[in-house]
Amino acid sequence: MDKLVIQGGVPLRGAIAVSGSKNAALPILMASILAEEPITYTNVPRLRDIFTTNKLLAILGCPAEFDGHTVTVTPCDLKPEAPYDLVKTMRASVLCLGPLLARLGEARVALPGGCAIGARPVDLHLTALEKMGATFDLDSGYIQGRCKKLRGAHIHFDFPTVGGTENLLMAATLAEGETILENVAREPEVVDLANFLIACGAKIEGHGSSVIKVQGVPRLGGCEYRIMPDRIEAGTFMVAAGITGGDLLLTDCPFEELEAVIAKLRDMGLIIEREGTRDVRVTHNGHLRARDVTTRPFPGFPTDMQAQIMALMTIASGAGVVEETIFENRFMHVPELVRMGADVKLSGHSAMVRGVQKLIGAPVMASDLRASASLVLAGLAAQGETHVQRIYHLDRGYERIEEKLNAVGARITRMPE
């Protein structure tokens, strides 16, 4: 198991290319199950979760070939079972449930794993699929689903679940008749999935709004599709510029998809400007101010940026409250930031952050993907040396993060623990 050793206190200057989006690529790759022809994906990030997804697709009968940042999937003899040894490492693997039911009328999927950040129930997925005609049993840790043929239905989500929206959107493309999904997730990654499905021949309207309408079609074909850039990686690098007092140009950077993050970072003192159509420059005016942050479904402030902006707030002037409304137990980075000298007090789903003059390097342990990123950011700003342990979480969601940061001045070494 590796760790990162970070020598802090170096302003970052230069250009960083934003990778393709992990959170868009995972469901889009799973949607390969729906297609009857080969598909070529470009701008695919080389991440542990992507490699796991490709292994899972191969087991399900959709072998995937990785070449650089291009993945070609060739559907052949589909099989209905997603085994535990792959699913246990990645919660997104439950997204094969809807496509398998739509194509085969059956699915046997192990209960998912992934980051340990509280309850992420799949009940919303199952309840909605039942309305389309599926039945489910829990058998030795596996979800066993069956249906004769999925039928279009009118489905209202109690909460705009991203995974539930994606699963039902995929299932509905091959269902009989029209499916109306209400109170759906509006995240850009959901829109990217819908655009991909449309490119394969699906009939979808309303993606990006709270109501999506899907008219089922008999089959989906193949296409070539470019995965959107990763807005969370881009936001993380924006914070890296601010927390080190640096000057970064982020190339192929999403902007509209990051409006809530950019607005909050500007309010804290960062200068964020577009350069051309797809590049963004990030600096700051020398004075960081703490601000209140509340996570919300898109277009609100994303929960996946909560830990990173908290790291920035630890060295800002004043105090701010970070409120987490999406996931429970998503403050596991707080004790580690406190080890580095941060002043953070927890109270239920909120954290009071009071800025300190400096952070001090220390050994810290990553507990989930975004917590890992916050500790790397804190290490970049800290005085002295920081050891971030258990970085396998980081490798699930950030492509070569230490190489990208070192290229703009950071001093980070990967080594065995």
From Swiss-Prot:
Keyword Cell division part of the UniProt annotation: yes
- Pathway where it operates: Cell wall biogenesis; peptidoglycan biosynthesis
Binding site residues for UDP-N-acetyl-alpha-D-glucosamine: 91, 120-124, 304, 326
Keyword set includes Transmembrane = no
Top EC class of this enzyme: transferase
Which Gene Ontology BP annotations are present? cell division; cell wall organization; peptidoglycan biosynthetic process; regulation of cell shape; UDP-N-acetylgalactosamine biosynthetic process
The protein's annotated catalytic reaction(s) are: phosphoenolpyruvate + UDP-N-acetyl-alpha-D-glucosamine = UDP-N-acetyl-3-O-(1-carboxyvinyl)-alpha-D-glucosamine + phosphate
Alphabetized, the UniProt keywords read: Cell cycle, Cell division, Cell shape, Cell wall biogenesis/degradation, Cytoplasm, Peptidoglycan synthesis, Pyruvate, Transferase
GO molecular function list: UDP-N-acetylglucosamine 1-carboxyvinyltransferase activity
Active-site residues, record numbering mapped to chain: 115
Q: Which residues carry this modification: 2-(S-cysteinyl)pyruvic acid O-phosphothioketal?
A: 115
Cellular component (GO) terms are: cytoplasm
Which Pfam families does the UniProt entry name for this protein? EPSP_synthase
SUPFAM superfamilies per record: EPT/RTPC-like
The entry's localization annotation reads: Cytoplasm
Which Enzyme Commission number(s) are listed? 2.5.1.7
Q: Which InterPro entries match?
A: Enolpyruvate_Tfrase_dom, Enolpyruvate_Tfrase_sf, MurA_subfamily, RNA3'P_cycl/enolpyr_Trfase_a/b, UDP_GlcNAc_COvinyl_MurA
| Binding sites annotated in the UniProt record for phosphoenolpyruvate | 22-23
- Annotated function: Cell wall formation. Adds enolpyruvyl to UDP-N-acetylglucosamine.
Protein family: Belongs to the EPSP synthase family. MurA subfamily.
Q: What is this protein called?
A: UDP-N-acetylglucosamine 1-carboxyvinyltransferase
Quick one: which gene encodes this? murA
